[in-house]
Amino acid sequence: MKGATNLFKSMRKPTNVGNFRQFSVNQVNSDNKRSEPGKKTHFGFTDVDEAEKEQKVHHVFANVAKKYDLMNDAMSMGVHRLWKDYYVGGLQVPYNAKCLDMAGGTGDIAFRILRHSPTAKVTVSDINQPMLDVGKKRAEKERDIQPSRAEWVCANAEQMPFESNTYDLFTMSFGIRNCTHPEKVVREAFRVLKPGGQLAILEFSEVNSALKPIYDAYSFNVIPVLGEILASDRASYQYLVESIRKFPNQDEFARIIREEGFSNVRYENLTFGVCSIHKGMKPRK
């Protein structure tokens, strides 16, 4: 185990399940008017209208929700658990903190935060109701976590239905690349955080060039096949692989975070850049 831990470190660089609120996707779309008619964006490697992308992404995660955690284990050979443990272990969570975990549907990050910080409360938010349903069912089995410490909210990350200056910590794990406008998500995170609040985003990123041929071969030839075998859905996992390649690289995403007002912006690569942890702070007034 010690050897495995050292290897991981060497691969990184500098029944009631709580409250539940729902904001329909249509209502959020109407209120936000984020997508401009006819304006193009990408859905994987395919160009689509912005509004169409949102619906396609929603369809992907509705399809994979029940097999989502199983597929994460299969695709990463369990390494995603190490990434998430390390990510949460490095969070600075104040006493009695209010945390917002966006795109947190199945609860993977929220449950870790609640164990890591016994006084914290977490709002788990996701645009996809089936993902939240899976998370709430998981919460029923988490006997060491008080249901009142978790709130489940169906909402869109590009216009969050939360008051400004509310949260001490904003987390988002493997979700922001699926958003049509990542910069708007970061902007909303800045808004809902208290002054001095922390942003921490875990996302797939640009892998080290030496590993790229092997990584690409595995991603394009193995992951879609696993999706077909384990989840009966090859297309959704083909999109997953493609979406990673379309997301900004580490430096570009750090620039977005900085431009939206965050200070002390930095990132840390895990597993040769397969994923990265991005952090920033909302300046104190």
Swiss-Prot record:
Sequence positions that bind S-adenosyl-L-methionine: 106, 126, 156-157, 173
Catalytic activity: a 2-methoxy-6-(all-trans-polyprenyl)benzene-1,4-diol + S-adenosyl-L-methionine = a 5-methoxy-2-methyl-3-(all-trans-polyprenyl)benzene-1,4-diol + S-adenosyl-L-homocysteine + H(+)
Pathway: Cofactor biosynthesis; ubiquinone biosynthesis
Topology in membrane: Peripheral membrane protein
Entry GO CC: extrinsic component of mitochondrial inner membrane
Statement: the UniProt record of this protein carries the keyword Kinase: no
One GO-annotated biological process of the protein: ubiquinone biosynthetic process
A Pfam family it matches: Ubie_methyltran
Residues annotated as transit peptide in the record: 1-30
Keyword Transferase set for record: yes
Cited SUPFAM superfamilies: S-adenosyl-L-methionine-dependent methyltransferases
GO MF terms, alphabetically ordered: 2-methoxy-6-polyprenyl-1,4-benzoquinol methyltransferase activity
Subunit structure: Component of a multi-subunit COQ enzyme complex.
Annotated function: Methyltransferase required for the conversion of 2-polyprenyl-6-methoxy-1,4-benzoquinol (DDMQH2) to 2-polyprenyl-3-methyl-6-methoxy-1,4-benzoquinol (DMQH2).
Record-stated family: Belongs to the class I-like SAM-binding methyltransferase superfamily. MenG/UbiE family.
Name of this protein: 2-methoxy-6-polyprenyl-1,4-benzoquinol methylase, mitochondrial
Organism field: Caenorhabditis elegans
Gene that specifies this protein: coq-5
